[in-house]
Structures are given as C-alpha cells and as structure tokens.
A protein has these predicted regions:
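Short glycine/serine- and small hydrophobic-enriched flexible loop segments
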Residues: 85-92
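Mid-domain beta-loop-alpha active-site segment that forms a flexible
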Residues: 75, 83, 123-127
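NAD(P)-dependent Rossmann-like dehydrogenase/reductase catalytic/cofactor-binding core
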Residues: 48-51, 58-70, 92-93, 98-174
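N-terminal alpha-helical segment
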Residues: 33, 83-84
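A broad, low-specificity signal for short, low-complexity segments enriched in glycine/proline
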Residues: 1-4, 130
Length: 174
C-alpha cells in the first residue's frame, strides 16, 4: 500500500492499516512526464520492499530516489518549496512578472524548459495553495505573501492550466 503524497508521510496513517510493514510513500513528481519517484518508509515498512521497488522502477522508465529518513516534502519538494515560495514572493512584491521569473530561471538553469510559474500552473494553483497551507501549519515562520497571492488567484478562479488562467493567461479556454 503506497501513498503518492509528499505532504503527508505514510507514518501519519500507519496505525490505521492492518499491515504497516507493507506501507510506504511512493511520490511520483508532477507533471506526470517527470520520471523521478521518491520512496520513503513509514518507519515500519518491511526492509525488503524499498530495495525491491528501487530495483524494479527503472524497468518502467522511472528513476527511484530513496528518502533516507522521514521528511515532509521528501527530497525534491523540500527544494522546490523554497523556489516556489520565493518565486511567488517576487511576483507578489511586484519585483518581476511570472514571464520574467520563468525567463531568467530558464537562462540561469541552463535551459530547464519549464520555469517555476509554468510548473505551478501545470500542477494547479489550488493544489499549490493546499500544499503551502499544510507546510505553513507544520513549519512555523514561513512567509505569508506567497500564500496570500495564491489565495487571491484561487479565489479569482485562476487555477492554472486546468482553468485556462493562472500565473499565466495564455492557456486558452479550459
């Protein structure tokens, strides 16, 4: 039994399953054409399960990364959270437009095809907001401005690509 959540570790619901030795997180990144998958134990996961998945996932075109200890956000999303929050702060403060943020990000990262604003639009700003609210609840001291901007966009129905408008307005009708 595997959870895809990177915000909620499977240890949070291990007591609710019959056999927690079969429980773990397998976090597939978004959008779905990104191939890393993070594997994290619930703390009671059978010691053979994660190595087995790490061995088999490459056969499906996936690159497994084992999270060595429980961590809300796992590996990538902890790094991504900082990029995302600072991106939203830059836009919220009027320092740069989403297009300018993505353009400089693209150039500075040797051509990563999608900047942080497009990626947040692809994930869905409502989803990004829910994750950010959860992180803020779990980690004191995170800046408020990024969540304020997200709340405003979501209230306006600007959810990203799925609604036709988000940080970008060029998606066409949803």
């Amino acid at each position: 039994l595997a959870s895809n959540s990177s915000s909620y570790p499977s240890s949070a619901f291990a007591s609710s399953v019959k056999n927690p030795a079969r429980l773990l997180n397998t976090h597939f990144l978004m959008p779905p054409d990104i191939i890393p998958v993070e594997l994290m134990s619930c703390g009671q996961t059978d010691a053979a399960i994660i190595p087995l998945l790490a061995e088999r996932f490459p056969g499906y075109g996936l690159t497994p990364y084992v999270v060595r200890r429980e961590s809300m956000g796992f590996i990538f999303n902890r790094i991504w959270a900082a990029i995302k929050r600072e991106t939203l702060a830059v836009v919220a403060e009027g320092v740069a437009t989403p297009q300018e943020v993505d353009a400089i990000y693209h150039q500075a990262t040797s051509g990563i095809p999608v900047g942080p604003c497009r990626l947040m639009d692809a994930v869905g700003l409502d989803v990004v907001l829910a994750i950010e609210e959860h992180y803020a609840h779990e980690r004191a001291g995170l800046p408020e401005a990024p969540r304020t901007l997200l709340r405003q966009l979501v209230a306006e129905g600007r959810l990203g690509a799925k609604s036709g408008r988000g940080l970008y307005d060029d998606y066409g009708p949803a």
